[in-house]
């Protein structure tokens, strides 16, 4: 629903606003009910269907008769005659070739749907109210960025002088509504399927709807040749042209005479309608459409139960498995771990240096042993006419190279010092 009390009238020739304003009709304050509009639209759209069905003679245009019993064949009617492969074949049944379908569609189905009169009127009022909400109009796909106001009202003088389509296009450009027509032109596509052969070749979007009064009849022929633009008398408004595809919020261009007739046709919340007997615009059940304002209102909060705030259960972690919990309980554990890592790194470096040193000693001893063996058994030997150096086997090397007593005493002393330092450091950090 619109909250605008007055509506400005625009001149279609100059595109400027006039000084006179019109009070917003009460029908724009009607409640917007999408469920009612959906029900009415579905029922009314079914009333335009053309009855269709299967011919009563389909699948039965053969000369066929059943052979009866006694021939060990089915009793289905069979094609009469002889001398052809077609003769004797089953006919008529839905399981036979060229037979009729099962349960053929009849044309005496329930094609029309009745809708309560008051519900139809209520749905039209809801669609008119939705057309005054810019958010709904824009959400439906209309291009209204340059439109001066919603609802858009054009004075009747500029409409009544229009006789040619180029004059109607000029008016739409002046009120910044032609961008919606360009959208329709760009959306033209060829329909897929059999509809191309049945008068529905082109698919296109819907453009603005021009609603006129009795004084603006000659402009209808000018507007009807513009793609996507529809025209309708204010007395003949229906859900089919106000909400195409059952989507409310169509962009409507009102003439001044048609806009002033709305209170007479639909009435107000207090006064009965003259154009629709027994109809009165319903009051909106929701006075404030802003749901955010309703939710955070202080008046509502007083009536509601206070929110229950449950105490948060502390998350307990095992410090022996969770390193972050251990550091939180004992900050020194991080420092101790860092120091232990440094000690382990230093020990690894010392061990690597010692291994490299021992490797050099073993290599030197192996070379000395090779030289002594060469002197004893000859420096070289001839194999297949080539001179080859004598190699010492590993077993002989292992038996020959051994630690001296002095080296064993040094290694025992070194291991004892390492163990003593580790024990002393562990006592110092408290492990």
Swiss-Prot record:
Cellular compartments annotated: Cytoplasm
Annotated Gene3D superfamilies: 3.40.1370.10
Pfam family, one: Ribosomal_L4
GO biological process, one term: translation
Region (Disordered): 77-96
InterPro entries per the UniProt record, alphabetical: Ribos_uL4_C_dom, Ribosomal_uL4, Ribosomal_uL4_dom_sf, Ribosomal_uL4_euk/arc_CS, Ribosomal_uL4_euk/arch
Main location: cytoplasm
Keyword Ribosomal protein applies: yes
Record GO terms (molecular function): RNA binding; structural constituent of ribosome
Family: Belongs to the universal ribosomal protein uL4 family.
Protein name per Swiss-Prot or TrEMBL: Large ribosomal subunit protein uL4
Lineage: Eukaryota, Amoebozoa, Evosea, Archamoebae, Mastigamoebida
Name of the encoding gene: RPL4
């Amino acid at each position: 629903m619109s909250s605008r009390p007055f509506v400005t009238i625009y001149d279609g020739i100059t595109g400027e606003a006039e000084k006179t304003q019109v009070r917003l009709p009460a029908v724009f304050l009607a409640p917007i009910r999408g469920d009612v509009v959906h029900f009415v639209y579905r029922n009314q759209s079914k009333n335009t269907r053309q009855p269709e069905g299967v011919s009563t003679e389909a699948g039965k245009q053969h000369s066929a008769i059943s052979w009866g019993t006694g021939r060990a064949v089915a009793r289905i009617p069979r094609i009469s005659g002889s001398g052809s492969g077609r003769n004797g074949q089953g006919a008529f049944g839905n399981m036979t070739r060229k037979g009729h379908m099962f349960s053929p569609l009849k044309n005496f189905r329930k094609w029309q749907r009745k809708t309560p009169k008051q519900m139809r009127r209520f749905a039209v009022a809801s669609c008119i109210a939705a057309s005054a909400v810019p958010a709904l109009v824009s959400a439906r796909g209309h291009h209204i960025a340059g439109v001066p106001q919603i609802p858009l009202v054009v004075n009747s003088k500029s409409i009544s002088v229009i006789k040619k389509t180029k004059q109607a296009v000029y008016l739409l450009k002046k009120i910044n509504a032609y961008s919606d027509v360009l959208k329709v032109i760009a959306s033209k596509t060829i329909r897929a399927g059999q509809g191309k052969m049945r008068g529905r070749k082109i698919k296109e979007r819907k453009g603005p709807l021009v609603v006129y009064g009795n004084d603006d009849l000659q402009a209808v022929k000018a507007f009807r040749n513009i793609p996507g633009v529809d025209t309708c008398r204010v007395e003949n408004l229906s859900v089919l042209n106000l909400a195409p595809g059952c989507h409310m919020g169509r962009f409507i261009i009102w003439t001044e005479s048609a806009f002033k007739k709305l209170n007479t046709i639909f009435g107000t919340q207090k006064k009965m309608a003259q154009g629709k007997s027994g109809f009165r615009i319903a009051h909106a059940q929701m006075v404030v459409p802003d749901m955010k304002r309703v939710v955070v209102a202080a008046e509502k909060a007083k009536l509601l139960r206070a929110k229950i705030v449950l105490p948060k259960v502390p998350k307990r972690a095992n410090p022996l498995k969770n390193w972050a919990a251990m550091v939180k309980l004992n900050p020194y554990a991080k420092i101790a771990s860092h120091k232990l890592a440094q000690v382990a790194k230093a020990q690894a470096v010392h061990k690597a240096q010692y291994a490299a040193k021992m490797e050099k000693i073993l290599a030197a001893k192996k070379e000395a042993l090779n030289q002594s063996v060469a002197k004893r058994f000859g420096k070289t030997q001839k194999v297949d006419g080539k001179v080859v150096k004598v190699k010492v086997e590993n077993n002989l090397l292992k038996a020959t190279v051994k630690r001296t007593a002095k080296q064993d005493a040094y290694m025992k002393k070194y291991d004892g010092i390492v163990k003593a330092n580790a024990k002393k450091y562990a006592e110092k950090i408290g492990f």
